[in-house]
Amino acid sequence: MKTPEHQAWNPTSWQTRPAQQQPSYRDATALADAVAKLSRLPPIVVSWEVDRLREELAAAQRGERFLLQGGDCAESFDDCESDKIAKRLKILLQMSLVLTHGLKKPIIRVGRMAGQYAKPRSADTETRDGVTLPSYRGDIVNHAEFTPEARAPDPQLLLRGYERAALTINFIRALIDGGFADLHHPEYWDLGFVGHSPFKVEYERIVASVADGLEFFETISSKEVHTALRADFYASHEALVLHYEQAQTRFIARNNRWYNLSTHMPWIGMRTAQLDGAHVEYCRGIANPVGVKVGTAMDAAWLQRLVTTLNPQNTPGKLTLIHRFGAKDIESALPKAIQAVRATGHSVLWICDPMHGNTESSQSGLKTRRFENILRELDLATRIHQDLGSHLGGVHVELTGEDVTECTGGARGLADLDLQRAYKSSVDPRLNYEQSLELALLIAERNRAPRRSR
């Protein structure tokens, strides 16, 4: 009998496996029609961009690059607005400039954008005042309003999700091609928080050094820096709603491979990483680089099987393991995970998600995360990898370019009482603009590479 990873694969073979976290559509014909329409639409990304990202991730595995992956916990259709997209892109690019300066290596920029419209839920239903309805699973599945009509999964939302994703990625490409007027000039960045930090001197030194380096580049190259340093930017989302992913899976004859062209880098979450499950089955057959969230519930045998199933040929850049243990558990859990993967003989890219393992409830009942715990998990991850002869190749964060108050701490010392001032997330708390940039400054300072000898 063939094991799951040795059975024949095609874009629909996931339908023969147990599929967690999938919507229960009432009308199978309407679903089939929506999937058929979606499969005829142009791809959102192209195969050569996917291949280029895989090559860059392979370089990150070798320690030659660093992955910055970030964006909203869950995108909403209403947030498909030029200003909000530009702010998210801008903070990611600003963070990448700071990290490039501090780490002295190129940064791979990957957004949780242009497709992050679905969210896994801990329960299939929600009950309010004695009324039970399907859980809200993200805008690509149903609506947040607590009514039977809004909560019914609607296949047409798959098409609306495609449209929003295409609009988002096209606008991002236009912004990158045109350059931001102030992106490469730190004197125009919003750095008001720096004066509130005990690391004020270090932050100011880093920002001044970035500005000096960019000014020097423009002087010797006779080009504006944003035209010479055009930033590649990639999209990623959790491959959760598999009918959507299936419909955008295309065979590229010149490569003789199947690609998911709804995004550059799909990932599998903890709730859908079952070895015999539909999500692992789907992701094992595509040429895209794939991420997998790794938490405390995943034992060594499970992790090892995932590695060999998702990347049987040990292709460099194919598999990124995103560990999310939390500051309190990382010291006991991460060494076991590193040793388990090493025993397979396979190479992976290790990156840290310091957000999900550090979620807690505030005194007012809002979900929040403490900046100090986020930073502590990153610090511990870096040290543990170094101690075990491995290396941390990136960071995965939930953030926004807006002035929200969802995570406590940071230079301004946001407290529980501050959260209600601008708490906008409908799912998980995000770092705001200032906290995101501060995190990049701290990573750059604590992992500063020595200056190369001339």
Label every PLM stretch briefly.
Residues 1-66:
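N-terminal basic/disordered segments at the start of proteins
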Residues 52-54, 276-279, 306, 335-337:
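Glycine-rich, charged/polar anion/phosphate-binding loops
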Residues 57-60, 98-100, 282-283, 384-387:
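A general structural signal for short secondary-structure junctions and capping/turn motifs
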Residues 68-73, 110-113, 352-355, 398-400:
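Short loop/turn segments at strand-loop or loop-helix junctions that form parts
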Residues 74-75, 79-326, 369, 377, ...:
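Active-site-facing alpha/beta catalytic cores
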Residues 294-295, 354-358:
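Conserved phosphate/anionic-ligand binding catalytic regions in large, soluble enzymes, centered on
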Residues 303-306, 310-312, 318-349, 356-405, ...:
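Non-transmembrane, aqueous-exposed alpha-helical and coiled segments at domain scale
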Residues 401-419:
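Short glycine/proline-rich, acidic loop/turn segments that cap or connect secondary-structure elements
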